[in-house]
Amino acid sequence: VAATCDLGIMASGRIRKQKHKQIGLSFDAPYFNAGVLMMDLKKWREGNYAADIIKLASENQFSNHDQDALNKFFMYNWQEIPLKWDVIPPVFNLFTKILTKPDLRKKAIEAKLKSAIFHYAGGYKPWEYEIYHGFNDKYYEYLSKTEFRDAKMPQFDKRRKNRSIKRQLLRLRLADFWMQIFK
């Protein structure tokens, strides 16, 4: 398996402790994001990995479900691919916990500048909001080129919409500010 490091988890001491407790992740072991995976399907099938991973996920209460099961199963046995292939919110928002760690900051800024895949993990889905530059404009640009361009999409809870998008926009503005300083 090959994947990108999950910088949101790698940068958080609290979550790293949680992963140590839940899946036995040692403090020096990298943790990957399962949003974009490269797999040797022949080896995957021959090793019957799916059954083992499903069993792990079924028998445990992992906070990140299949991602934790995959990380436990492939601990120390996966390859890292460049972060640009799975850019998650902690990266495109340049969270402080990433900015304060020079090695992670460098990876995040490089991925943000050369993004190939945006992975809208977490609570902010691009289709729940009108077009906002830097957040979901590329999503809408590519959606307009597909057969799904006129499909009705799920909408965010309107009671939280304004507060939440304001928070997200503030994060994006801060990320733009940090990009100017660190790039």
Q: Model regions: which residues?
A:
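Flexible glycine/proline-enriched surface loops and loop-helix/loop-strand junctions
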Residues: 18-23, 52-55
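Short, P/G- and charge-enriched loop/turn segments at secondary-structure junctions
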Residues: 21-27, 102-107
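A recurrent flexible, glycine/aromatic-enriched loop bordering the glycosyltransferase active site
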Residues: 24-36
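A glycosyltransferase accessory/donor-loop signature
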Residues: 34, 39-183
